[in-house]
Swiss-Prot record:
Gene Ontology MF annotations: chromatin binding; DNA-binding transcription factor binding; histone acetyltransferase binding; histone deacetylase activity; histone deacetylase activity, NAD-dependent; histone deacetylase binding; histone H4K16 deacetylase activity, NAD-dependent; NAD+ binding
Expression sites (tissue/organ): Expressed in the cerebellum, cerebral cortex and cervival spinal cord. Expressed in Purkinje cells, oligodendrocytes and Schwann cells (at protein level). Expressed in the central nervous system (CNS).
Protein role: NAD-dependent protein deacetylase, which deacetylates internal lysines on histone and alpha-tubulin as well as many other proteins such as key transcription factors. Participates in the modulation of multiple and diverse biological processes such as cell cycle control, genomic integrity, microtubule dynamics, cell differentiation, metabolic networks, and autophagy. Plays a major role in the control of cell cycle progression and genomic stability.
Gene of this entry: Sirt2
Keyword Membrane attributed: yes
Descriptive protein name: NAD-dependent protein deacetylase sirtuin-2
Span of domain Deacetylase sirtuin-type: 20-301
Residues reported in the UniProt entry to bind NAD(+): 48-52, 58-60, 130-133, 225-226, 249-251, 287
Signal sequence coordinates: none
EC number of this enzyme: 2.3.1.286, 2.3.1.-
Known regulation of activity: Inhibited by Sirtinol, A3 and M15 small molecules. Inhibited by nicotinamide. Inhibited by a macrocyclic peptide inhibitor S2iL5. Inhibited by EP300-induced acetylation.
Keyword vocabulary terms for this entry: Autophagy, Cell cycle, Cell division, Cell membrane, Cell projection, Chromosome, Cytoplasm, Cytoskeleton, Differentiation, Meiosis, Membrane, Metal-binding, Microtubule, Mitosis, NAD, Neurogenesis, Nucleus, Phosphoprotein, Transcription, Transcription regulation, Transferase, Ubl conjugation, Zinc
């Protein structure tokens, strides 16, 4: 194995010196880079962790995650609820769950509005999201700003490929909340929201945007994702080798051995702690607090006001101040832990 590792390292240049664009592998270093002329195009890669403060569970947390709370649906295993083969035979569990998680019942979080600020300041190249809650759209991102890698509730289609009739979000919502399994008006087969189930291909837009975006990205900001689901997880390796990557998450993730990653076709993983680390920064903690800390360092004082204003608008439109109370601006932890879990060994080794 060591022989192969050395051979591939030399052949693929895995051990060669890379250009370092961050003067410090901390959130402060990322901030200074974002304020420089070198950083003009930012891609955000986001997962369920950016929506948990809105009251939407993530998938894999041991006690609070979605997979840990599906016993009432009597599934053969938790992931079956999102498998297309199981859905076609037993759609009822999915639609029961969909009623609980349906878009429109939750407000965007601080993370969502931070991404909107990136757009307003001309920095956002694209937001790639694994989420199907549509909160990026509610926060103000346009379809062209987004790659909804795992699909969306905005449209639905008949699962009968010879039919394929399209249905609107309002049509699907009416069916779900009437507790009726949505059936095609044309052929009576089940109608499924256009979210990507296990066993289905990702939308073509995912691959077309991936080809055009990552060759020119200046910074990756990765938030609230375990980076365990392919091919989304492989996006971290699509950026140029010099491009800095900031992870805002509860734990470090995406750390794949470069040699094994290349052998498996996943690309090089993230490196936060080794002596060769040169572009990856991890901020560990609540995603909203991480965005607040970064916004503070950037001088973007308007973030919290934006969240309050937009939440008030949503409440006014819904006619209820009680809707989604968990999504209000979370209390700031003082001071913002701007350096928390950024590569702390840096000064010891230099």
């Amino acid at each position: 194995m060591d022989f192969l590792r050395n051979l591939f390292t030399q052949t693929l240049g895995l051990g060669s010196q890379k250009e370092r664009l961050l003067d410090e592998l901390t959130l402060e270093g990322v901030t200074r880079y974002m304020q420089s002329e070198r950083c003009r195009r930012v891609i955000c890669l986001v997962g369920a962790g950016i929506s948990t403060s809105a009251g939407i569970p993530d998938f894999r947390s041991p006690s609070t995650g979605l997979y840990a709370n599906l016993e009432k649906y009597h599934l053969p295993y938790p992931e079956a609820i999102f498998e297309i083969s199981y859905f076609k035979k037993h759609p009822e569990p999915f639609f029961a769950l969909a009623k609980e998680l349906y878009p429109g019942q939750f407000k965007p979080t601080i993370c969502h509005y931070f991404i909107r600020l990136l757009k307003e300041k001309g920095l956002l190249l694209r937001c790639y999201t694994q989420n199907i809650d549509t909160l990026e759209r509610v926060a103000g991102l346009e379809p062209q700003d987004l790659v909804e890698a795992h699909g969306t509730f905005y449209t639905s289609h008949c699962v009968n490929t010879s039919c394929g009739k399209e249905y609107t979000m309002s049509w699907m919502k009416e069916k779900i909340f009437s507790e009726a399994t949505p059936k095609c008006e044309k052929c009576q087969n089940v109608v499924k929201p256009d979210i990507v189930f296990f066993g289905e291909n990702l939308p073509p837009r995912f691959f077309s945007c991936m080809q055009s975006d990552f060759s020119k990205v200046d910074l990756l900001i990765i938030m609230g994702t375990s980076l365990q689901v392919q091919p989304f997880a492989s996006l971290i390796s699509k950026a140029p080798l010099a491009t800095p990557r900031l992870l805002i998450n509860k734990e470090k993730t995406g750390q794949t051995d470069p040699f094994l990653g290349m052998m498996m076709g996943l690309g090089g993983g993230m490196d936060f702690d080794s002596k060769k680390a040169y572009r990856d920064v991890a901020w560990l903690g609540d995603c909203d607090q991480g965005c607040l800390a970064l916004a503070d360092l950037l001088g973007w004082k308007e973030l919290e006001d934006l969240v309050r204003r937009e939440h008030a608008n949503i409440d006014a439109q819904s006619g209820s101040q009680a809707s989604n109370p968990s999504a209000t601006v979370s209390p700031r932890k003082s001071p913002p832990p701007a350096k928390e879990a950024a590569r702390t060994k840096e000064k010891e080794e230099h």
